């Protein structure tokens, strides 16, 4: 096990060398990608030097094109996508993941309207066959968040929750992610997507957890929570 901190990586959008350098220089015990990966080759090839430390969630741009999708979902690191589950690192830290974004065609909580679909299977059943991707929902919606994604995660416990979307402290965030974090008992949330890193520390006591955003191609080191 590498003895260093956890390395959280804001949306790489196809750029990798800064992540590899930071992982090696810090001896990071885990490298955690916050979505919008957009690798031009299979992800395991892009991160070959550090692949055994990598965990990730997908972002909305990872379903923009078939190549993006294949390089993430069909890479040899596909089993390191922690969307919808909790993984326990060798140091004992439990990390939960929620990839993708809220979309009005599925569910956009800030509009205060009922979800149109509860889950991907329900959505796929109402999608014309010619519009399905890999016999499921259209390609774009492989990165949409469904209510059941959050319901299933809320039954689990974790120390850190990583999301692509921002929680409620952010101007463009979602209170539903605050509630998810509290139900899971997490101490810390970390997100990408917004390409910024806003100081939310004034909200931590009220919301019940620490929250961090990592900017575009940004990096954040955090000690594990043994």
Question: Which positions does each model-derived feature cover?
Answer:
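Core catalytic region of metal-dependent phosphoesterases/phosphodiesterases
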Residues: 8-9, 13-90, 175, 182-183, ...
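Histidine-centered divalent metal-coordination motifs
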Residues: 11-13, 36-37, 60-61, 164-165, ...
């Amino acid at each position: 096990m590498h003895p260093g901190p956890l390395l959280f990586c804001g949306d790489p959008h196809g750029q990798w060398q800064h992540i590899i350098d930071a992982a090696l220089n810090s001896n990071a015990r885990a490298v955690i990608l916050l979505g919008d990966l957009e690798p031009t080759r299979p992800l395991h090839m892009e991160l070959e030097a550090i692949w055994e430390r990598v965990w990730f969630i997908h972002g909305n741009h990872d379903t923009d094109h078939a190549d993006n999708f294949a390089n993430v979902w069909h890479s040899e690191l596909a089993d390191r996508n922690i969307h919808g589950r909790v993984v326990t690192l060798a140091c004992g830290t439990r990390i939960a993941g929620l990839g993708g974004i809220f979309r009005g065609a599925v569910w956009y909580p800030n509009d205060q309207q009922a979800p149109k679909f509860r889950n991907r299977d329900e959505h796929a059943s109402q999608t014309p066959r010619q519009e399905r991707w890999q016999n499921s929902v259209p390609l774009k919606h492989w990165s949409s968040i469904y209510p059941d994604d959050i319901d299933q995660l809320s039954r689990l416990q974790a120390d850190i929750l990583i999301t692509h979307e921002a929680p409620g402290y952010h101007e463009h965030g979602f209170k539903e992610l605050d509630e998810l974090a509290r139900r899971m008992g997490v101490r810390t949330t970390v997100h990408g997507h917004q390409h910024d890193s806003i100081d939310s520390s004034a909200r931590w006591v009220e919301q019940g957890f620490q929250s961090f955003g990592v900017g575009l191609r940004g990096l954040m080191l955090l000690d594990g929570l043994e």
